[in-house]
Amino acid sequence: MEHSFWHSKWQKNEIGFHEPEGNALLIKYASSLLDVENSHSALKRIFVPLCGKTRDIGWLLSQGCEVVGAELSEVAIIQLFEELGAEPTITPTAKGKVYAKDGLTIHVGDIFKLTSSDIGDVTGVYDRAALVALPSPLREQYAAHLITITQCAPQLIISFEYDQNEMAGPPFSVNEKTVDALYSADYNIQRLERSVLEGGLKGKVDADNLVFALKAK
């Protein structure tokens, strides 16, 4: 991963992609994650890759979920806990640091170094910021790694589709064909929504929202 890019974004507070409230599409389609039958536990434990300081985490916690996140930028995670009003326990590890408090655990470091034992059992994956943050060469590696460390847990993916020639990204355009190519060997994929992104992406380019539910085959 290009570590310096994301560290710089957070240090300079250049985080226009960060929404002040929980994402409306998460709230609309959360049942695809939270209503999944799980024989191991009634508790919903959701993995949020490349989570940043998204307030979606607070919303998931408010629904009674435990949340496990992975994020490269420690600045983002410090801000996340401050905004949640929570004082985390911070544990250094060989792979970075773990911030934890009241059902929320964030692994600060390179997501590609995490294993299934690091994150523990999860009942679902919420990906609103990972696929669209990664350039094309890294997406295949990311998808394969995510399948491994989450043991093919169900996913809710929110992405954008737009003309990549009009804006370089990130966030990058990730269309339905790309999601199918990355995940169709392991998951049944259902597109839940395609809708126009009001105001465009960052106000610069026309774009559509795409929402997918993935269930293991």
For the regions a protein language model found, what residue spans apply to each?
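Conserved acetyl-CoA-binding loop of GNAT-fold acetyltransferases
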Residues: 65
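A short SAM/SAH-binding and catalytic strip from SAM-dependent methyltransferases
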Residues: 111-113, 123-138
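Generic beta-sheet signal
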Residues: 44-46, 123
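Class I SAM-dependent methyltransferase "Motif I" SAM/SAH-binding loop
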Residues: 47-54, 130
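Class I (Rossmann-like) S-adenosyl-L-methionine-dependent methyltransferase catalytic domain
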Residues: 1-44, 53-57, 69-104, 108-118, ...
